[in-house]
Amino acid sequence: SGPGSRSGCGAGRTVSRYTLGIDTSNYATSLAVFDTAGEVVCAKKRFLPVKAGQLGLRQSDSLFHHTVALPEMMQELAQEFDLTQIDAVGVSQKPRPVEGSYMPCFLAGVNAATAFAHAKGIPLVLTTHQQGHAAAALFAAKGEQLFAEKVLLFHISGGTTDLLLCDQVRRITTLGTSTDLYAGQAVDRVGVRLGFGFPAGAEVSRLAA
């Protein structure tokens, strides 16, 4: 069988250009293949192992688990999609697009993306975790139309409770932020107290529904 003929989530696609996205945040290792329309063709996600009752991991442990998970997940992705069709790689290099934003866990994704891009001779696009959230929200709302506009966006997660002004996602200005506990942290703390694993957002949402 040749390129494009594999069974799985990449089979039967006629779009010839694909982008591989990599994100190694403080919570999960994530891989996704997108086509030129911005549709997810194939995706893999693995939450980092956190001991019961704990509220996260040390950065050194997060980096270790990402480093272990990435080769395994790339192999899983390759079994479902022909990675020779990838034309570009995008990766989160830090939490937010501001000076001083840094977490070691993102180095795992950057290293994997850089090696993949250089080996194939394809473009490498460095972005941030927050810009990834913003782009996903805009796609979910109105697709590509909002990428040409300035929009106000609330980013509520484990590490942020921010009001953002997004200009085509490439330029993000923080208009307001929490000076206390972030919303996602509050949800996780409640969830862990209730006996759920970390992160607990999905379980708390199901309980509240």
Regions found by a protein language model. Give the residues of each.
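Conserved phosphate-binding catalytic cores of ATP/NTP-utilizing and phosphoryl-transfer enzymes
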Residues: S16-R17, I122, L126-V151
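Short beta-strand-loop/turn "lid" adjacent to the catalytic site in phosphate-handling enzymes
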Residues: Q75-T114
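Short beta-strand scaffold segments in enzyme catalytic cores
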Residues: T29-D35, A135, L153-H155, T161-L165
